Amino acid sequence: MKISKLLNGILCSVFCLNTLIGCSGESPYKQIAKAQTLDYNGIPVYIEPDEKTLQMTIDKYFEQLEKQPDYLMKNCTEIHFQCEDIFIKRMLDEGFVQNETEAELISGSTTNTTVYMNTRTKKLGSIDVDENDFKETLTHELWHVYDDTHQIGDSYPSDNVQIVSIYNQNPSLLGEYGATNTLEFFAEAGEMYIYEPDKLKEKSIDLYNYFESLPKE
C-alpha cells in the first residue's frame, strides 16, 4: 500500500514537472525566444530572434536596460534586439559595412534615436559575449543617440571644439575604435565616463570635465 502511494506520488511529480517545462522535457533555461515586442518605460523593445536565440539570453540582456542612466535612455525611441543574421543583414543593406567580416566586428549601431543590438553570445565564432559586454555596448550606442539629440545650432556634442581638440592631439587616447572618428571617440569616452570615471580622469581630465558639463536632465 505504501509502495503504491509512493509510486503515485512520483508519477504525480513527474506529471507536474512536465506540465511546467513541457512534455518534451526541455529545460526552461533552453527555451527558444519568440519574436515579440516588449516595453521598457514606454520604449518599445523589438525582439528579433532566430532558432538559436535563447529566452534566457534575451532576459539577461533586457535587464541591462535598467542599468542605463535615465538621461541616456530618455532620448531613445525604440530598441531592436536582433539575432546575428538579422543584425548583419541590416548593416549590409543600409551600407554601414562593406562585407560580413566587417559586420561581425560590430555589436551595436544607431540610426537617429533607434538602437540596434546584436544578441549573440559569441563573436567571431569563439569570443564570449556576456550581459556586461552587452550593457557597455548599449551605453556606447545610447551616447550616439544623446549626441544626435543634443544639437546646439550646427554643433553636436561630438564635434564640440573641446572634443575635437583632444581627439586631434591623440586620436588613440581611448583605443583603436575610439580613434575611428570624433563620433566614436565621443561614445567611447561617454562609456568610460560612466563605468570607469577614474580611468577617464587619468587619460584626460579635460575630457572628463567635458562630460561632467553635459546636460543630464
Residue ranges and their predicted role:
Residues 20-22:
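C-terminal motif of bacterial Sec signal peptides marking the signal peptidase cleavage site
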Residues 8, 131, 135, 183:
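Hydrophobic (often cysteine-bearing) scaffold residues that line and stabilize catalytic clefts
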Residues 158-217:
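Metalloprotease/metallohydrolase-associated module, dominated by Zn2+-dependent proteases
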